[in-house]
Amino acid sequence: MKIITDVTNNVLDDEAATVLLSTFQISPQNTQEQAVRSAMKFFTVNGFVRPAIDYAKAWPNPSKAHLFAFNQGNPFPGQFQGDATHTVDALYQFQTMAHLFPTQVDKDIGVDFALALIDFAHGIENIPPIGKDGTLKVWGPNGKPGRIMTLDQDPYQLKKELDLIKELGVLKVWGIMGGYLTAP
């Protein structure tokens, strides 16, 4: 965590650094488990969620850009149980461990998600274009099946974090990530 706090303080002014670090609960005083969770959220928001939204919004023809959000948490016991991350969506998407999902709700949302992606890949537009309204299809949390939402409805449950990144500037925050990843 010291690396992230040091890089953040080098890239941003004091006030912005304090807000960013507190929003993501990043502190040198974190326990190892807290540090991993805070870093995971920071990198998930900035490495996956924010770029996906920005790329979809920047697409030259918004009727040809589609965005989905898989926000179902990890169903398996352990440190990351309940957390929705990029690897969890792949776990549900590919269905290779579906027989190990602990509940029928997990199995059902996995099938719904996987079939929607397969259909979409075969030209069935069951995931609407993002358009000017920021429309996307969302699965989860808590077993909620795929449904249509807009970005204004906070489908990722990360509005505070995403708004802050937008305010500070995506490239500055990516600079913090890059500084962390290249630190010794």
Task: Tell where the protein language model's regions lie, with residue ranges.
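C-terminal structured subdomain/cap of oxidoreductase catalytic cores
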Residues: D83-K132, V138, G143, L164, ...
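Substrate-gating cap/lid region and adjacent catalytic-acid/histidine neighborhood
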Residues: M1-V105
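Short, surface-exposed polybasic-aromatic patches that bind anionic ligands, especially phosphate groups
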Residues: G169-V170
